[in-house]
């Protein structure tokens, strides 16, 4: 629905008989929620989810806009796939869908995609999704291109050698459950590296998620000097 007016004294005597009063006492009202990291199964993994089921699930939770990750089959790394995504999103979805493209070809962390061309087709940002750019030289090139083109880059902060075979954060719970833990440092080293690069290369940068209290401390301190987002 749409908010037409706000008032303190709304009752059946001062509204149209066609209107319905819903008691929201003790409730919260929000604008449509934006989910910035959504993995949709289309194309390639439609048995998991497609644009129609995604939009229905999102709407049931108050989400009206999603940013989709490029980890599909094929990977979203060229303009022909972007055109397909936009058509499918328009035809099948009831919500706003904004696709991202991969930072690197086939999300292999080596060769950059064509930022300028992909942006011209409606891509709003670049990320390798659940993969992290491990090579600092590659990340430097990515940031420089993002700066030149005013592109948004989104990083999954995780040193994937340190986190290899990990299931959950390392700690008491992982020990009790007998699961391989992911050490906190796996997240910290990527955040520190990228934010150090960001001090010298002023581009639009977003940390896709954080899972560590120490990461929060680092982010709070670095935000005093440089602009970036996280969450």
Enumerate the language-model features and the residues they cover:
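Histidine/acidic residue-rich metal-binding segments in metalloenzymes
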Residues: 112-231
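Metal-associated gating/positioning segment near the N- to mid-region
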Residues: 27-89
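Histidine-rich, glycine-flanked metal-binding segment
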Residues: 1-31
């Amino acid at each position: 629905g749409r908010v037409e007016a706000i008032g303190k004294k709304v009752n059946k005597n001062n509204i149209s008989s066609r209107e319905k009063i819903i008691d929201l006492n003790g409730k919260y009202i929000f604008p449509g929620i934006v989910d910035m990291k959504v993995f949709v199964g289309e194309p390639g993994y439609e048995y998991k989810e497609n644009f129609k089921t995604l939009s229905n699930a999102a709407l049931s939770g108050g989400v009206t806009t999603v940013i989709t990750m490029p980890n599909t089959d094929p990977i979203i790394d060229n303009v022909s796939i972007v055109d397909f995504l936009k058509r499918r999103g328009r035809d099948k979805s009831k919500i706003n869908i904004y696709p991202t493209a991969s930072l690197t070809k086939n999300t292999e962390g080596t060769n950059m995609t064509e930022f300028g061309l992909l942006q011209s087709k409606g891509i709003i940002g670049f990320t390798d999704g659940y993969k992290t750019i491990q090579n600092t030289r590659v990340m430097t090139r990515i940031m420089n291109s993002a700066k030149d083109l005013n592109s948004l880059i989104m990083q999954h902060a995780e040193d994937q050698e340190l986190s290899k075979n990990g299931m959950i954060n390392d700690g008491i719970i992982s020990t009790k459950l007998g699961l391989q833990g992911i050490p906190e440092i796996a997240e910290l080293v990527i955040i520190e590296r990228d934010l150090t690069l960001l001090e010298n290369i002023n581009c639009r940068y977003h940390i896709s998620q954080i899972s560590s209290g120490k990461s929060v401390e680092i982010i709070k301190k670095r935000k005093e000097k440089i602009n970036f987002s996280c969450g």
